[in-house]
Amino acid sequence: MQIFHNLNEWIRFRNSLSPDLSLGFAPTMGNLHAGHASLFLASSKENHYTVSSLFVNPTQFNNPDDYKHYPRTVDADLELMTQNGVDFCILPNENEIYTDGYAYQVQENRLGQLMEGKHRPGHFNGVLTIVMKLFNLVKPTCAYFGEKDYQQLLLIQGMVKALFMDIEIKSCPTVREKSGLACSSRNNRLTPSQREIADEFAKIFHQNKSSAMISKELEALGITVEYIEEFQGRRFAAVKIGDIRLIDNYLL
């Protein structure tokens, strides 16, 4: 796997590649897990080359403490990429990415105001802006995103369509732990007792009951429910276990 620490080096290399070659792209913020690995493997099966990126994007954190405490596990992340078919990895720094000081932003004013957008103001502006920048740098044929962040997936699909970007967005199923808990970088921050509660969250959330009944059961376990909502035939949830925020969704 080739690693690019400098964006100008990457741009020169990207421009040297034949336009006949397909590039799959799976952007990440690091602290990788089995869900990320599934994106890399899907891309490597369908493209000549697979590209990933490691960049903890400050503009999508509405809570500065979350950004500060986001785990940086670069060596382990690069190893996981190497083992799962990534050919090129870009590791840009913040000054390279935000040469404009975040003066220019991508904003969506409908879906981006619901659920995650309502509870995390500015989050999706940061997500869409960084994804747009990375798309322009990588120029992928296809880009791969997990269904765990389904609202994000819909917004990226919408952005690509609205802005006439010649990129195919591929969705990959949520990868879950044995308990049914969705794989997430945040799971690593759970204490053993919180992990047990998180496993119960996954089981209760997937019950064939009303959102109100599910909320009541979760709250009885001491879980803070931010929202449980149904949208476009899926059920979405965001909860807090202690100070760890978890999200999930599934097709009804």
UniProtKB/Swiss-Prot annotation:
Q: Which Gene3D superfamilies match?
A: HUPs, Pantoate-beta-alanine ligase, C-terminal domain
Protein name per Swiss-Prot or TrEMBL: Pantothenate synthetase
General remark = The reaction proceeds by a bi uni uni bi ping pong mechanism.
Q: Where does (R)-pantoate bind?
A: Q60, Q152
Pfam families assigned: Pantoate_ligase (PF02569)
Q: Where in the cell is it found?
A: Cytoplasm
List the pathway annotation.
Cofactor biosynthesis; (R)-pantothenate biosynthesis; (R)-pantothenate from (R)-pantoate and beta-alanine: step 1/1
Q: Which reaction does it catalyse?
A: (R)-pantoate + beta-alanine + ATP = (R)-pantothenate + AMP + diphosphate + H(+)
User: Which class of enzymes does this protein belong to?
Assistant: ligase
List of residues binding ATP: 29-36, 146-149, 175, 183-186
Q: Name one GO molecular function term.
A: ATP binding
NCBIfam families given in the database record = panC (TIGR00018)
Q: Name one GO biological process term.
A: pantothenate biosynthetic process
Family listed:
Belongs to the pantothenate synthetase family.
- Residues annotated for beta-alanine binding in this entry: Q60
